[in-house]
């Protein structure tokens, strides 16, 4: 789809501030409307409004929008579905229906208070109180036994499920009992179809899957369950259920009782759920995601082969009495003004342009920092950005670190999609790393695996200030983020336009 959009966003009086980020929208020449607080705009204060204006250029598929300040994303989120333009279909058999499924977390406590507690205490947050499918907790909680998200299907028909992980701090499995899913899209980009019995989505990722109603008439649980590869991290060890229900005049719509192991046509069948830390299965699943076809009209592959800038980014947690997180041992400090506004108006003192291209010291990253190298465990704190010339082909190597403990980090880049060329176990070695330049997936969020590395490439052809951060909200709070400043080009349509007149002020 190509088309312009204007969206009016207002912060209601009982919220101090908010704003909206259009996750996955590449915002071509519209960086002012990208949305992250203190990066491209100031928050929209209570009672104020701001009109987002941007063009969807050669994009389609399942994306989503969410708040991008504090932990308001816990409940302030929703789907953004971009359909193919008229006359252009799907590269697969059209489904009879489609359904959006948003995976989320439910908190009994005020999430803004939780964020303040994390900052003030220096510790980690507790796990959420429940997981939700489209806002519903499902049958395993006393308060919600009848609040179950349900999809009605007709035997023999095909359905498209658009699945979004909007959770704050948890990666999740998704599966449907006795059904195989065919993956056809990730992060709004078509993929080579492949069959799977489960998905694993990091926060910020989306998957489109086809599912055929080819089982016996009855009910089947749709399940979301936590994936937690990090050791000793607190999280809710619980599953939430929805129902896939086959329509039939002989099956009555009964109230669902407690989870039962009795398998009848009236009791939903349960899926087989992977172990909570089954990293091998998750890696095998992720490795199947490929671009549709290298030279196909639906998704041409244009991987930059000549690299202008290579960046080696270590990512992970730090500890020195309090938890911190960093990129190249720099913990990001959010400024008090919008970085984009500071850049455009040449405001001094709000950021520096010396973000390191690589770690100060090289060592065995995965197995932890040597105790005698304090710089590797005590991060610097600052608001530093990395400068990219317009049009540069950029390669970024993400390296997970084990200073506190290895963990999976879903890294999201604003303003661009990127080619995920490969991942590998241990410390990155350019002489042995196997990179896929033929049909790599095109994504906006990459789950850097536990104790592994990941390599991406993109072309920096969109001027502006672009945030890159871990989509586990607690890690962003601790500072696992940075920003790229992409400079103006010399040609037509290569310069950042002036700010809108109604841009919120700090």
Placement of each model-derived feature along the sequence:
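Short, structured patches in soluble enzyme cores that scaffold and shape functional sites
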Residues: 56, 69, 82-84, 103-105, ...
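Histidine- and aromatic-enriched segments that form or immediately flank copper-ligand environments
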Residues: 1-92, 170-199, 219-236, 321-459, ...
């Amino acid at each position: 789809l190509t088309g312009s959009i204007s969206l009016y966003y207002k912060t209601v009086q009982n919220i101090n501030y908010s704003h909206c980020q259009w996750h996955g929208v590449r915002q071509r020449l519209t960086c002012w409307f990208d949305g992250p607080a203190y990066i491209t705009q100031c928050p929209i204060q209570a009672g104020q409004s701001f009109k987002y204006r941007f063009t969807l250029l050669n994009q389609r598929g399942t994306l989503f929008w969410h708040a991008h300040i504090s932990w308001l994303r816990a409940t302030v989120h929703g789907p953004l579905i971009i359909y193919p333009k008229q006359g252009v279909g799907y590269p697969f058999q059209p489904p009879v229906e489609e359904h959006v499924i948003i995976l989320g977390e439910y908190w009994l406590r005020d999430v803004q208070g939780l964020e303040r507690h994390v900052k003030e205490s220096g510790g980690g947050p507790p796990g959420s109180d429940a997981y939700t499918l489209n806002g519903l907790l499902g049958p395993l909680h006393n308060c919600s036994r009848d609040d179950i998200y349900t999809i009605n299907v007709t035997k023999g028909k095909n359905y498209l499920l658009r699945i979004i992980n909007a959770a704050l701090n948890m990666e999740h499995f998704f599966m449907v009992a006795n059904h195989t899913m065919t993956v056809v899209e990730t992060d709004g980009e078509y993929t080579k179809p492949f069959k799977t019995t489960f998905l694993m989505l990091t926060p910020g990722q989306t998957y489109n899957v086809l599912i055929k109603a080819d089982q016996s008439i009855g009910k089947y649980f749709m399940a979301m369950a936590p994936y937690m590869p990090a050791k000793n991290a607190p999280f809710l060890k619980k599953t939430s259920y929805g129902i896939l229900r086959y329509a039939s005049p002989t099956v009555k719509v009964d109230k669902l009782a407690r989870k039962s192991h009795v398998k009848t046509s009236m009791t939903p069948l349960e899926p087989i759920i992977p172990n909570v830390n089954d990293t091998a299965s998750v890696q095998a699943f992720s490795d199947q995601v490929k671009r549709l076809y290298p030279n196909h009209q639906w998704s041409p592959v244009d991987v930059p082969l000549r690299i202008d800038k290579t960046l080696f980014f270590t990512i992970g947690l730090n500890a020195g009495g309090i938890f911190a997180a960093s990129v190249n041992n720099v913990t990001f400090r959010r400024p008090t003004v919008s970085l984009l506004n500071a850049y455009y108006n040449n405001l001094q003192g709000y950021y520096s342009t010396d973000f390191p291209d690589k770690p100060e010291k090289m060592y065995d990253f995965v197995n932890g920092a040597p105790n005698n190298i304090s710089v590797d465990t005590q991060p610097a704190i600052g608001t530093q950005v990395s400068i990219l010339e317009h049009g540069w082909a950029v390669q970024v190597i993400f390296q997970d670190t084990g200073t506190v403990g290895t963990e999976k980090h879903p890294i999201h880049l604003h303003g661009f999609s990127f080619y995920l060329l490969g991942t590998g176990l241990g410390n990155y070695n350019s002489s042995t790393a196997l990179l896929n330049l033929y049909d790599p997936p095109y994504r906006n969020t990459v789950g850097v695996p536990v104790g592994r590395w990941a390599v991406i490439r993109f072309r920096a052809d969109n001027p502006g200030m672009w945030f890159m951060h871990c989509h586990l909200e607690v890690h962003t709070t601790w500072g696992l983020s940075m920003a790229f400043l992409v400079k103006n080009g010399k040609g037509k349509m290569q310069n950042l336009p002036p700010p809108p007149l109604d841009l919120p002020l700090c």
